[in-house]
Amino acid sequence: SQLEPGKSDGETAVRVQLTEPPVAAGRVELNNYGSRTTGANQGVIALNANNVTGIGDQLALNGIGSEGSQYGQLAYSLPASPNGLRLGAAGTYMNYKNVSNYASPNGGVGDAWTAGLSAAYPLIRSQATNLNTTLNYDIKSYMNKNNTTQTVISSYNINNLSLGLSGNHYDGFGGGGISTGSVSVVFGYLDILGTSAPGYGAYTPPSFTKFAFSGSRNQQLTEDGLTSIYLAISGQLASVNLNSAEQFYLGGPYGVRAYPVAQAAGTQGGLATLEVRRQLPQNFTLSAFFDAGTVQQYKNTYQGWQGLTHANNTYSLMGAGLGLKWIYDGWNVSGAVAWRVGSNPLYNQYGQAVNTDGTNTNPRGWITGSYTF
């Protein structure tokens, strides 16, 4: 669907095109969205087989590869009732090896797998408004080792049950816009199987609850539909200190873009983005953006909690920059350059600012290119 000028002044129309999905579809992508630990440059492939058995089911295969990691996902879903109930099952596997020795001379190696069941049901389905509810159960397993000695650094399982609501709404306010939102609550259990790190997990209770939320608004600013403003927020709250696999992160191409992937991890946090976009000739879109986020590392602090970052328990990151996107006939290429706003709150024992990837890059650039077929 897309927004376009209405028949009368001040009106916005929503164009919805209903088409039968192709039997097979896919996407290939190259980007630098990965972690420096396992290789920033990534290759991505996504393949979908639609209506596999003739009942509206879908089989999906996704993969991501970098210099030091390989990730794969297999998912299947099918309609379970005439009124929109859909059931699904998915599994993932990832292995990694630390290809950069900035964090530790011994590096790290490990793997992880997940398995999950899902159910989704539409509460509201209309041209202007949609509201869906979801129920998911996931099992996650992680193993991390010292690459030199093969000693287990950490091994643990997580069981999660989550309930969620998500939706969108199209309206004609101020020239037309699209609003989206989602909320979810997760009830989880952490089972630490083994570790060689002293005190690992001592301040991370096994049972936890967390609440996650997100929302966005894409608002037209001009009558010609060429200029828009985009606002997005997201975050999470938690009952106790969380394991790193369940934490909230601020940095990266989908967060505060002036900072690297996995920067600013915490049990609780919030993130906001403001972006002004202008469509240009030849299918280009220019944007200017501002990102800001706050993270609380621990719900409950303990002796020695600061570790190597020497930051306050609660701190903020900010950044601003420019982006350019080109879309044409299945091709999608975009890039962004972001500068830090304010000082970096993370520093080492010598008082030097440092990021989680061992660099102090400023500005920081992100680029991705994909083709959909």
Kindly give the residue locations of the regions a language model identified.
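Residues that define the transmembrane beta-barrel architecture of outer-membrane proteins
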Residues: 10, 39-43, 68-72, 111-115, ...
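C-terminal outer-membrane beta-barrel translocator/porin domains of Gram-negative envelope proteins
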Residues: 143-307
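Outer-membrane beta-barrel "beta-signal"
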Residues: 47, 324-332, 337, 357-373
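Repeated loop/turn-to-beta-strand initiation elements of outer-membrane beta-barrel proteins
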Residues: 24-26, 53-59, 82-88, 96-98, ...
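Outer-membrane beta-barrel translocator/channel fold
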Residues: 91-115, 121-122, 140, 144-148, ...
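Transmembrane beta-barrel strands of outer-membrane/channel proteins
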Residues: 3, 28-32, 45, 61-65, ...
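Outer-membrane beta-barrel initiation region
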Residues: 1-88, 125
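Membrane-embedded beta-strands of outer-membrane beta-barrel proteins
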Residues: 14, 45, 74-76, 117, ...
